[in-house]
Curated annotation (Swiss-Prot):
Organism: Mycobacterium tuberculosis (strain ATCC 25618 / H37Rv)
Protein name per the record: Antitoxin VapB33
Keywords, sorted A to Z: Toxin-antitoxin system
GO biological process: positive regulation of growth
Described purpose of this protein according to its UniProt entry: Antitoxin component of a type II toxin-antitoxin (TA) system. Upon expression in M.smegmatis neutralizes the effect of cognate toxin VapC33.
């Protein structure tokens, strides 16, 4: 469809800059710009937010002891695997 438009000088400069920069025909640059400008707004999803939760180790629990136990269990599993491989 042919339509005559009167463009402001600054808009003409913007279009000409885009034509040269993108190496596309003026018709295509203007059509794409109008499509983007007139398209319905994209609904943005609300950003997922993780709320921190306060937690603490109960008194009387020894974290170093847990780490030591985990190390010992890991060592034991490795030794068992080595023995089975023989």
């Amino acid at each position: 469809m042919r339509t005559t438009l009167t463009l402001d000088d600054d808009v003409v400069r913007l279009v000409e800059d885009a034509v040269h920069r993108e190496r596309r025909p003026m018709k295509q640059v203007i059509n794409d710009a109008l499509r983007r400008a007139l398209a319905p707004p994209v609904k943005r999803q609300e950003q997922y937010r993780l709320e921190p939760h306060e937690s603490a180790v109960r008194s009387g629990l020894d974290l170093a002891g847990f780490n030591k136990l985990a190390d010992e269990l890991e060592d034991e599993a490795l030794l068992d695997a080595t023995r089975r491989a023989r």
